[in-house]
Amino acid sequence: QKDGHAVRYGNAYDQLGGEGAVYESGDVSSYQITVYKPGFKTPGFFQGANVYQIFPDRFYKSGAAKGEIPTGRTFHENWQDQPDWAPNAQGKITNTDFFGGDLQGIREKRPYLKELGVPCLYMNPIFESHSNHRYDTGDYRKVDPILGTNTDFKKLCAAAADCGIRIVLDGVFAHTGADSRYFNRFRHYPGCGAYNSRSSVYVRWYSFAHYPDDYKCWWDFKDLPAINAANPDWRKYMITGERSIVRTWLRDGASGWRLDVADELPDDVLRDMRAAAKAANPDSVLLGEVWEDAVTKVSYGERRQYALGDALDSVMNYPLRDALVAFLTGRS
Protein backbone atom coordinates (compact mmCIF):
# COMPACT_ATOMS: atom_id res chain seq x y z
CA GLN A 1 0.00 0.00 0.00
CA LYS A 2 1.00 3.61 -0.59
CA ASP A 3 -0.49 6.54 1.34
CA GLY A 4 -3.35 4.34 2.43
CA HIS A 5 -4.33 2.99 -1.01
CA ALA A 6 -3.27 -0.14 -2.84
CA VAL A 7 -0.70 -0.17 -5.65
CA ARG A 8 0.29 -3.02 -7.89
CA TYR A 9 3.56 -4.05 -9.44
CA GLY A 10 3.58 -5.62 -12.90
CA ASN A 11 4.87 -5.54 -16.44
CA ALA A 12 6.58 -2.41 -17.79
CA TYR A 13 4.22 0.15 -19.27
CA ASP A 14 5.46 -0.57 -22.81
CA GLN A 15 4.86 -4.30 -22.22
CA LEU A 16 8.32 -5.14 -23.54
CA GLY A 17 9.52 -6.92 -20.41
CA GLY A 18 12.58 -6.09 -18.34
CA GLU A 19 12.17 -4.05 -15.15
CA GLY A 20 8.54 -3.80 -14.06
CA ALA A 21 6.40 -0.82 -13.16
CA VAL A 22 4.12 0.35 -10.36
CA TYR A 23 0.42 0.76 -11.11
CA GLU A 24 -1.55 3.05 -8.81
CA SER A 25 -4.89 2.53 -10.49
CA GLY A 26 -6.51 0.37 -13.11
CA ASP A 27 -5.55 -3.08 -14.27
CA VAL A 28 -1.96 -4.21 -14.48
CA SER A 29 -0.80 -4.86 -18.03
CA SER A 30 -0.80 -8.57 -18.68
CA TYR A 31 2.50 -10.38 -18.68
CA GLN A 32 3.93 -13.84 -19.11
CA ILE A 33 6.60 -15.69 -17.19
CA THR A 34 8.38 -18.36 -19.21
CA VAL A 35 10.23 -20.98 -17.20
CA TYR A 36 12.20 -24.09 -18.06
CA LYS A 37 13.63 -27.04 -16.19
CA PRO A 38 16.93 -26.62 -14.31
CA GLY A 39 19.88 -27.92 -16.27
CA PHE A 40 18.24 -27.43 -19.68
CA LYS A 41 20.99 -26.90 -22.26
CA THR A 42 20.87 -26.49 -26.01
CA PRO A 43 23.63 -27.74 -28.35
CA GLY A 44 26.56 -25.35 -28.51
CA PHE A 45 27.03 -25.69 -32.27
CA PHE A 46 23.49 -24.42 -32.91
CA GLN A 47 23.65 -21.32 -30.74
CA GLY A 48 24.00 -18.29 -33.00
CA ALA A 49 24.59 -20.46 -36.06
CA ASN A 50 23.62 -19.37 -39.56
CA VAL A 51 21.72 -22.37 -40.88
CA TYR A 52 21.78 -22.95 -44.65
CA GLN A 53 18.69 -24.73 -45.98
CA ILE A 54 19.00 -27.10 -48.94
CA PHE A 55 16.19 -28.51 -51.06
CA PRO A 56 18.17 -31.56 -52.25
CA ASP A 57 16.66 -32.01 -55.73
CA ARG A 58 17.51 -28.42 -56.74
CA PHE A 59 20.87 -27.70 -55.05
CA TYR A 60 23.50 -29.37 -57.23
CA LYS A 61 23.64 -32.39 -59.55
CA SER A 62 26.88 -34.34 -59.40
CA GLY A 63 26.31 -36.36 -62.56
CA ALA A 64 26.66 -39.65 -60.70
CA ALA A 65 24.58 -42.49 -62.12
CA LYS A 66 21.16 -43.01 -60.56
CA GLY A 67 20.03 -46.50 -59.68
CA GLU A 68 16.79 -48.25 -58.69
CA ILE A 69 14.60 -45.36 -59.79
CA PRO A 70 10.93 -46.17 -59.09
CA THR A 71 8.46 -45.89 -61.95
CA GLY A 72 6.36 -42.79 -62.48
CA ARG A 73 9.15 -40.25 -62.16
CA THR A 74 10.28 -37.87 -64.90
CA PHE A 75 13.55 -35.94 -65.19
CA HIS A 76 14.32 -32.49 -66.57
CA GLU A 77 17.28 -32.39 -68.93
CA ASN A 78 17.61 -28.62 -68.52
CA TRP A 79 18.50 -27.43 -65.02
CA GLN A 80 16.82 -24.09 -65.79
CA ASP A 81 13.42 -25.61 -66.63
CA GLN A 82 10.33 -24.58 -64.71
CA PRO A 83 8.96 -27.34 -62.44
CA ASP A 84 5.81 -29.10 -63.61
CA TRP A 85 3.47 -27.44 -61.15
CA ALA A 86 0.24 -27.56 -63.16
CA PRO A 87 -2.41 -30.29 -62.61
CA ASN A 88 -2.43 -33.25 -64.99
CA ALA A 89 -5.41 -34.40 -67.09
CA GLN A 90 -7.01 -35.87 -63.96
CA GLY A 91 -6.68 -32.56 -62.12
CA LYS A 92 -3.92 -33.83 -59.82
CA ILE A 93 -0.58 -32.17 -59.10
CA THR A 94 1.78 -35.15 -58.91
CA ASN A 95 5.08 -33.47 -57.94
CA THR A 96 6.92 -36.30 -59.70
CA ASP A 97 9.27 -34.29 -61.93
CA PHE A 98 12.89 -34.19 -60.80
CA PHE A 99 16.02 -32.21 -61.63
CA GLY A 100 18.48 -34.71 -60.18
CA GLY A 101 20.26 -32.89 -57.39
CA ASP A 102 21.95 -35.39 -55.08
CA LEU A 103 23.99 -35.93 -51.93
CA GLN A 104 27.24 -36.24 -53.86
CA GLY A 105 26.49 -32.85 -55.39
CA ILE A 106 26.16 -31.33 -51.92
CA ARG A 107 29.43 -32.96 -50.93
CA GLU A 108 31.16 -31.49 -53.99
CA LYS A 109 29.99 -28.01 -52.97
CA ARG A 110 31.64 -28.14 -49.55
CA PRO A 111 34.26 -25.49 -50.47
CA TYR A 112 31.48 -23.10 -51.50
CA LEU A 113 29.55 -23.70 -48.28
CA LYS A 114 32.68 -23.36 -46.19
CA GLU A 115 33.54 -20.08 -47.92
CA LEU A 116 30.09 -18.78 -46.99
CA GLY A 117 30.86 -19.58 -43.37
CA VAL A 118 28.03 -22.08 -43.04
CA PRO A 119 28.27 -24.09 -39.78
CA CYS A 120 25.06 -26.07 -40.25
CA LEU A 121 23.01 -27.46 -43.15
CA TYR A 122 19.30 -28.14 -42.79
CA MET A 123 18.20 -30.47 -45.57
CA ASN A 124 14.60 -30.96 -46.63
CA PRO A 125 13.59 -34.66 -46.58
CA ILE A 126 16.04 -37.13 -48.11
CA PHE A 127 14.24 -40.45 -47.59
CA GLU A 128 12.70 -42.49 -50.37
CA SER A 129 9.43 -40.88 -51.42
CA HIS A 130 7.16 -40.65 -54.44
CA SER A 131 7.32 -36.86 -54.76
CA ASN A 132 10.12 -34.39 -55.40
CA HIS A 133 9.48 -32.59 -52.08
CA ARG A 134 9.68 -35.92 -50.23
CA TYR A 135 7.26 -35.00 -47.45
CA ASP A 136 5.40 -38.22 -48.32
CA THR A 137 7.92 -40.69 -46.93
CA GLY A 138 7.99 -44.13 -48.53
CA ASP A 139 10.82 -45.73 -46.52
CA TYR A 140 12.48 -44.08 -43.52
CA ARG A 141 15.43 -46.44 -43.62
CA LYS A 142 16.50 -45.63 -47.16
CA VAL A 143 17.88 -42.52 -48.86
CA ASP A 144 15.89 -41.76 -52.00
CA PRO A 145 17.77 -43.40 -54.90
CA ILE A 146 17.68 -40.17 -56.92
CA LEU A 147 19.72 -38.58 -54.12
CA GLY A 148 22.09 -41.51 -53.67
CA THR A 149 22.55 -44.22 -51.08
CA ASN A 150 22.80 -44.54 -47.31
CA THR A 151 26.56 -44.79 -47.80
CA ASP A 152 26.53 -41.49 -49.69
CA PHE A 153 24.81 -39.92 -46.69
CA LYS A 154 27.48 -41.18 -44.30
CA LYS A 155 30.19 -39.86 -46.63
CA LEU A 156 28.48 -36.48 -46.81
CA CYS A 157 28.26 -36.19 -43.02
CA ALA A 158 31.91 -37.18 -42.57
CA ALA A 159 33.11 -34.79 -45.28
CA ALA A 160 30.98 -31.95 -43.92
CA ALA A 161 32.32 -32.54 -40.41
CA ASP A 162 35.86 -32.16 -41.77
CA CYS A 163 34.82 -28.66 -42.86
CA GLY A 164 33.18 -27.87 -39.53
CA ILE A 165 29.67 -28.25 -40.94
CA ARG A 166 26.85 -30.12 -39.16
CA ILE A 167 23.82 -31.63 -40.92
CA VAL A 168 20.25 -31.50 -39.61
CA LEU A 169 17.64 -33.75 -41.21
CA ASP A 170 13.95 -33.09 -41.82
CA GLY A 171 11.89 -35.57 -39.81
CA VAL A 172 8.43 -36.07 -41.32
CA PHE A 173 6.98 -38.26 -38.58
CA ALA A 174 3.35 -37.12 -38.21
CA HIS A 175 2.33 -38.76 -41.49
CA THR A 176 3.73 -41.07 -44.15
CA GLY A 177 3.07 -41.33 -47.85
CA ALA A 178 0.13 -43.40 -49.03
CA ASP A 179 2.73 -44.77 -51.45
CA SER A 180 4.98 -46.27 -48.78
CA ARG A 181 6.01 -49.63 -47.44
CA TYR A 182 3.94 -48.82 -44.34
CA PHE A 183 0.62 -47.91 -46.01
CA ASN A 184 1.26 -49.33 -49.50
CA ARG A 185 -1.97 -48.13 -51.09
CA PHE A 186 -0.64 -48.62 -54.62
CA ARG A 187 1.23 -51.89 -53.95
CA HIS A 188 4.53 -50.49 -55.15
CA TYR A 189 6.26 -52.12 -52.19
CA PRO A 190 6.61 -55.80 -51.34
CA GLY A 191 4.82 -57.05 -48.27
CA CYS A 192 1.56 -56.04 -46.71
CA GLY A 193 0.88 -52.41 -45.85
CA ALA A 194 -1.87 -50.99 -43.65
CA TYR A 195 -4.12 -50.39 -46.67
CA ASN A 196 -3.76 -53.96 -47.94
CA SER A 197 -4.91 -55.99 -44.95
CA ARG A 198 -6.29 -55.58 -41.44
CA SER A 199 -3.64 -58.09 -40.35
CA SER A 200 -0.76 -55.85 -41.51
CA VAL A 201 1.79 -55.06 -38.82
CA TYR A 202 1.34 -51.41 -39.77
CA VAL A 203 -2.45 -51.17 -39.66
CA ARG A 204 -2.55 -49.73 -36.12
CA TRP A 205 -0.08 -47.04 -37.13
CA TYR A 206 -3.06 -45.33 -38.78
CA SER A 207 -6.67 -44.42 -37.94
CA PHE A 208 -9.42 -45.84 -40.18
CA ALA A 209 -13.06 -44.74 -39.93
CA HIS A 210 -14.16 -47.23 -42.59
CA TYR A 211 -11.46 -49.61 -43.76
CA PRO A 212 -9.62 -49.26 -46.09
CA ASP A 213 -10.53 -46.05 -47.97
CA ASP A 214 -11.71 -43.78 -45.16
CA TYR A 215 -8.64 -42.94 -43.11
CA LYS A 216 -7.35 -39.92 -41.22
CA CYS A 217 -5.02 -37.75 -43.30
CA TRP A 218 -2.89 -34.70 -42.77
CA TRP A 219 -5.16 -31.77 -43.72
CA ASP A 220 -7.33 -34.24 -45.68
CA PHE A 221 -4.63 -34.98 -48.27
CA LYS A 222 -5.27 -38.62 -49.15
CA ASP A 223 -1.63 -39.01 -50.20
CA LEU A 224 -0.58 -38.30 -46.60
CA PRO A 225 -2.21 -40.73 -44.13
CA ALA A 226 -1.75 -39.45 -40.59
CA ILE A 227 0.08 -41.46 -37.96
CA ASN A 228 -1.51 -42.67 -34.73
CA ALA A 229 1.29 -41.49 -32.46
CA ALA A 230 -0.16 -43.35 -29.48
CA ASN A 231 0.60 -46.71 -31.09
CA PRO A 232 3.48 -48.41 -29.23
CA ASP A 233 4.76 -50.24 -32.32
CA TRP A 234 5.09 -46.97 -34.22
CA ARG A 235 6.88 -45.39 -31.26
CA LYS A 236 9.34 -48.26 -31.04
CA TYR A 237 10.06 -48.17 -34.79
CA MET A 238 10.43 -44.39 -34.96
CA ILE A 239 11.69 -43.35 -31.53
CA THR A 240 12.27 -45.68 -28.61
CA GLY A 241 13.76 -48.81 -30.17
CA GLU A 242 17.50 -49.31 -30.25
CA ARG A 243 17.36 -49.23 -34.09
CA SER A 244 14.72 -46.52 -34.24
CA ILE A 245 14.70 -44.03 -37.08
CA VAL A 246 15.50 -41.13 -34.75
CA ARG A 247 18.56 -42.91 -33.33
CA THR A 248 19.84 -44.59 -36.51
CA TRP A 249 20.36 -41.51 -38.65
CA LEU A 250 22.03 -39.63 -35.81
CA ARG A 251 24.45 -42.51 -35.38
CA ASP A 252 25.08 -42.43 -39.12
CA GLY A 253 26.29 -38.84 -38.92
CA ALA A 254 23.36 -36.42 -38.63
CA SER A 255 23.54 -33.77 -35.92
CA GLY A 256 19.83 -33.31 -35.34
CA TRP A 257 16.26 -33.34 -36.52
CA ARG A 258 13.94 -30.58 -37.67
CA LEU A 259 10.47 -31.94 -36.91
CA ASP A 260 7.92 -31.27 -39.62
CA VAL A 261 4.50 -30.13 -38.30
CA ALA A 262 5.58 -30.54 -34.68
CA ASP A 263 2.09 -29.47 -33.59
CA GLU A 264 0.77 -32.83 -34.83
CA LEU A 265 2.98 -34.74 -32.39
CA PRO A 266 1.88 -34.88 -28.71
CA ASP A 267 4.19 -33.51 -26.03
CA ASP A 268 4.93 -36.97 -24.64
CA VAL A 269 6.12 -38.05 -28.11
CA LEU A 270 8.40 -35.02 -28.31
CA ARG A 271 9.83 -35.86 -24.89
CA ASP A 272 10.54 -39.41 -26.05
CA MET A 273 12.16 -38.05 -29.21
CA ARG A 274 14.39 -35.77 -27.18
CA ALA A 275 15.47 -38.63 -24.94
CA ALA A 276 16.20 -40.88 -27.94
CA ALA A 277 18.09 -38.18 -29.83
CA LYS A 278 20.25 -37.21 -26.86
CA ALA A 279 20.99 -40.88 -26.16
CA ALA A 280 22.27 -41.35 -29.70
CA ASN A 281 24.12 -38.03 -29.85
CA PRO A 282 24.16 -35.82 -26.73
CA ASP A 283 25.05 -32.78 -28.86
CA SER A 284 22.20 -33.26 -31.34
CA VAL A 285 19.52 -30.61 -31.84
CA LEU A 286 15.74 -31.09 -31.89
CA LEU A 287 14.07 -28.27 -33.78
CA GLY A 288 10.31 -27.92 -34.25
CA GLU A 289 8.26 -26.45 -37.06
CA VAL A 290 5.95 -24.24 -35.00
CA TRP A 291 4.30 -21.36 -36.85
CA GLU A 292 3.13 -19.36 -33.84
CA ASP A 293 4.74 -18.21 -30.58
CA ALA A 294 6.07 -21.49 -29.20
CA VAL A 295 5.71 -20.49 -25.54
CA THR A 296 1.99 -19.67 -25.87
CA LYS A 297 1.06 -22.24 -28.51
CA VAL A 298 -2.20 -24.15 -28.12
CA SER A 299 -2.93 -27.01 -30.52
CA TYR A 300 -5.88 -29.39 -30.42
CA GLY A 301 -7.01 -27.79 -27.17
CA GLU A 302 -3.71 -28.40 -25.36
CA ARG A 303 -1.23 -25.74 -24.27
CA ARG A 304 2.04 -27.04 -25.64
CA GLN A 305 5.18 -27.58 -23.57
CA TYR A 306 7.77 -26.94 -26.28
CA ALA A 307 9.88 -24.55 -24.22
CA LEU A 308 9.89 -26.22 -20.80
CA GLY A 309 13.24 -27.92 -21.30
CA ASP A 310 12.36 -31.56 -21.91
CA ALA A 311 11.04 -31.41 -25.47
CA LEU A 312 12.38 -29.14 -28.23
CA ASP A 313 15.70 -27.31 -28.20
CA SER A 314 14.25 -24.57 -30.37
CA VAL A 315 11.71 -23.78 -33.10
CA MET A 316 11.75 -22.26 -36.59
CA ASN A 317 10.62 -18.88 -35.15
CA TYR A 318 8.32 -17.75 -37.92
CA PRO A 319 6.93 -14.88 -35.76
CA LEU A 320 10.41 -13.31 -35.81
CA ARG A 321 10.59 -13.81 -39.57
CA ASP A 322 7.21 -12.14 -40.00
CA ALA A 323 8.29 -9.19 -37.86
CA LEU A 324 11.55 -8.74 -39.78
CA VAL A 325 9.81 -8.89 -43.17
CA ALA A 326 7.19 -6.40 -41.99
CA PHE A 327 9.88 -4.02 -40.75
CA LEU A 328 11.97 -4.25 -43.92
CA THR A 329 8.96 -3.74 -46.18
CA GLY A 330 7.58 -0.82 -44.21
CA ARG A 331 4.56 -2.59 -42.78
CA SER A 332 3.52 -2.41 -39.14
Predicted ranges, named:
Residues 36, 55-57, 230, 289, ...:
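Structured loops at beta-to-helix junctions and adjacent beta-edge loops in soluble globular domains
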